[in-house]
Amino acid sequence: MVKLGNNFAEKGTKQPLLEDGFDTIPLMTPLDVNQLQFPPPDKVVVKTKTEYEPDRKKGKARPPQIAEFTVSITEGVTERFKVSVLVLFALAFLTCVVFLVVYKVYKYDRACPDGFVLKNTQCIPEGLESYYAEQDSSAREKFYTVINHYNLAKQSITRSVSPWMSVLSEEKLSEQETEAAEKSA
């Protein structure tokens, strides 16, 4: 263990170990300035580009020539075609993003407030759930029910006569009479 409260001013002198079992090692040692930076070199050599050029001319330290093998799928293709393909890919990506957003909107799990129940993508009060359960059926059945009601209504309702129907029918009769008179004459 280390005994706290050592005096740093006595850095050169070592205190003997005390009998109480504590070491007298200081927790922090003073910083020596000579450790911070190295002495500057006596001579600095800076090589310029002209000193490197002779090595290159002599053939020393040249990397070996490696044949390049590249395959380009865009070689021989016009810039207009490249831009067109890029635009098509961008439009396809944006279309996918739009379809994903639309799908998430329609399939979004909606949470209803307290006292309401989600029924056919609508929040309805719990008290009216039994009423909606009686009407609940598939879309095809609803379609046929509507058509049957329409046919029954069409058959059961007598044809209503508009006040204009009598005027129109009289005009047709008068036209037919004039045509018949013209043919006979």
Swiss-Prot record:
It holds the Pfam family Calcyon. One of its GO terms (molecular function) is ionotropic glutamate receptor binding. The chain crosses the membrane at residues 83-103. Residues 1-82 are cytoplasmic. Residues 104-185 are lumenal. GO terms for biological process: amyloid precursor protein metabolic process; apoptotic process; clathrin coat assembly; endosomal transport; neurotransmitter receptor cycle; neurotransmitter receptor transport, endosome to postsynaptic membrane; positive regulation of receptor recycling; postsynaptic neurotransmitter receptor cycle. The keyword Ribosomal protein does not apply. One of its GO terms (cellular component) is endoplasmic reticulum membrane. Residues 129-164 are annotated as: Required for GRIP1 interaction. It is found in: Membrane; Golgi apparatus, trans-Golgi network membrane; Endosome membrane; Cell projection, Dendrite. Induction: Up-regulated by TP53 after DNA damage. Up-regulated by genotoxic stress. The keyword Metal-binding does not apply. InterPro entries: NSG (IPR009431). Forms a complex with GRIP1, GRIA2 and STX12 through direct interaction with GRIP1; controls the intracellular fate of AMPAR and the endosomal sorting of the GRIA2 subunit toward recycling and membrane targeting. Interacts with STX12. Interacts with APP; could regulate APP processing. Interacts with FAM171A1. Plays a role in the recycling mechanism in neurons of multiple receptors, including AMPAR, APP and L1CAM and acts at the level of early endosomes to promote sorting of receptors toward a recycling pathway. Regulates sorting and recycling of GRIA2 through interaction with GRIP1 and then contributes to the regulation of synaptic transmission and plasticity by affecting the recycling and targeting of AMPA receptors to the synapse. Is required for faithful sorting of L1CAM to axons by facilitating trafficking from somatodendritic early endosome or the recycling endosome. This is Neuronal vesicle trafficking-associated protein 1.
